[in-house]
Swiss-Prot record:
SUPFAM superfamilies: Carbamate kinase-like
TM region(s), chain numbering: none
Family: Belongs to the acetylglutamate kinase family. ArgB subfamily.
InterPro entries listed in its UniProt record: AceGlu_kinase-like_sf (IPR036393), AcgluKinase_fam (IPR004662), ArgB (IPR037528), Asp/Glu/Uridylate_kinase (IPR001048), Glu/AcGlu_kinase (IPR001057), NAGK-C (IPR041727)
Protein name: Acetylglutamate kinase
Chain sites annotated for binding substrate: 76-77, 98, 192
Summary of the function given for this chain in its UniProt record: Catalyzes the ATP-dependent phosphorylation of N-acetyl-L-glutamate.
Gene name of the encoded protein: argB
Organism, scientific name: Chlorobium phaeobacteroides (strain DSM 266 / SMG 266 / 2430)
Lineage of origin: Bacteria, Pseudomonadati, Chlorobiota, Chlorobiia, Chlorobiales
Length: 303
């Protein structure tokens, strides 16, 4: 990572001339992405630390102010667990997904659609943005079907369809939709939906320019190095060699599935650093890993 990105990422004050250089570097990207749609999946430490929450809200507001349509999909697993504990309910997981019975789905709905969603909307508004809270239940935003392991997971759903007309309407009005990942089926049953899966489905349905995962992972590591870009062929080789392993494998495979669905690029960035979202989008080098269909040898770091 170049020294300037390191300074800005750390939260330290960078020299004015260096900040000016970043602004100049950002200009072609601002022009390029005006009118485009970015879907951002917001989760991890960036949702817990007050400084990081404010930084993220500032970043999202700026993206919208320069003409980018921002659609935000958030998680909230820790908040759900805390609320459940206060209500005397224990949280159980199966292969990383929350087992969701009738009692737990009420906790999920109350927590995600209530406190978590509205806190994000409030923060964005405090920084000058115009956000609107949305759940998958509103205007059929997310129609769901039972997941394949419903016998073990209960009311956990997969996305069946997305109401793109409603989301587009909000974006055209200059609003930032903040979407809680719950949905319902044709019988009216409500489902808890994995936020990563919901963000991927929304990005594909909207034919988004980018899907950006704000997480607790810096990107894809090869040894001590963070890959700036990775294409499908490289990923297959790294998985075969064991360089990409464990829980990172499904994330990588999901990213390329989303690319195959028509999304322009997928980005994986670390939300534990201030302004990582802007640095990833508006600098040549970026701060995370972008997933692309194939490598462009003429523009290897092009965001």
């Amino acid at each position: 990572m170049n020294p300037l990105c390191s300074e800005l990422k750390s939260g330290r004050n960078a020299p004015p001339a260096a900040i000016g250089q970043v602004l100049i570097e950002a200009l072609p990207y601002i022009r390029k992405f005006e009118g485009k749609t970015f879907v951002i999946k917001y989760g991890g430490s960036a949702m817990k630390d007050d400084k990081l929450k404010n930084s993220f809200a500032q970043n999202v507001t700026l993206l919208r102010k320069v003409g980018i349509n921002v659609v935000l999909v958030h998680g909230g697993g820790d908040a759900i667990t805390r609320t459940a504990e206060k209500m005397g309910l224990s949280s159980r997981f199966h292969h990383g997904k929350r087992v969701t019975d009738i009692e737990m789905i009420s906790v999920v709905q109350m927590t995600l659609a209530g406190k978590v969603n509205q806190d994000i909307v409030r923060l964005i508004s405090e920084h000058g943005g115009k956000a609107v809270g949305v759940t998958g239940l509103d205007a059929d935003t997310i129609k769901a079907i039972p997941c394949q392991n419903a016998d073990k997971l209960g009311l956990v759903g997969d996305v069946e369809s997305i109401n793109t007309l409603y989301i587009d309407l909000l974006c055209r009005a200059g609003l930032i939709p903040v979407i809680a990942p719950i949905g319902y089926d044709e019988d009216g049953s409500i489902y808890n939906i994995n936020a990563d899966d919901a963000a991927s489905s929304i990005a594909i349905a909207l034919k988004a320019e980018k899907l950006i995962y704000v997480s607790d992972v810096e990107g894809i590591h090869v040894g001590e190095r963070i890959l700036k870009t990775i294409c499908k062929a490289e990923a297959a080789d790294f998985i075969e060699q064991g360089i990409i392993s464990g829980g990172m494998i499904p994330k990588v495979l999901s990213a390329f599935k989303t690319l195959d669905g028509g999304v322009g690029k997928i980005h994986l960035i670390d939300g534990k650093f201030t302004h990582s979202l802007l640095l990833e989008i508006f600098t040549h080098e970026g701060v995370g890993t972008q997933f692309i269909a194939e490598q462009d040898n003429d523009n290897p770091g092009k965001r």
